[in-house]
Curated annotation (Swiss-Prot):
This is Putative pre-16S rRNA nuclease. Keywords: Cytoplasm, Hydrolase, Nuclease, Ribosome biogenesis. It comes from Wolbachia sp. subsp. Drosophila simulans (strain wRi). GO terms for biological process: rRNA 5'-end processing. Belongs to the YqgF nuclease family. Coiled coil: none annotated. The keyword rRNA-binding does not apply.
Amino acid sequence: MLHRNPDEFLKSIPKDKRIMCLDMGEKQIGIAFSDKTQLIATAHSIYHRKNMSKDLGYLHRIFKENEAGSMVIGIPLNIDEQETKWCKTIIQFANKIIKKYKVNTYLQDESLSTSIATHTLKITGISITKSKKIDDKISACIILQRTLDKINTIK
């Protein structure tokens, strides 16, 4: 099921399972996972997209390998919280994951997550060249931590 309400998503999350997060891009996907207590997000990897079938297969495999029970996908809302054109593509992708793998999925506003990731990497002394290679997984981590903070204030 696709959730937009954190209260509803919280009710659907299996306890003692990790939550997987995706920062969707046209060419690559940043991936992060929570710990099993669902308190802390950790950057995992960047997946370079190939085609829909391979993308879905890879994401499902690492979802299972990391013992995840639900998923968060970042969507880029405008400053007035309206959906952008890219949101439609992301929602279609999310619906394919849900239909094929029956994964409860929450859409989290990802506004400024890439800017925050890039700035964070810059102040830690990581070069711009290297930061461009890892900022998507850091963005996924930021998106997931926002969600974890939100659902843990509800608990």
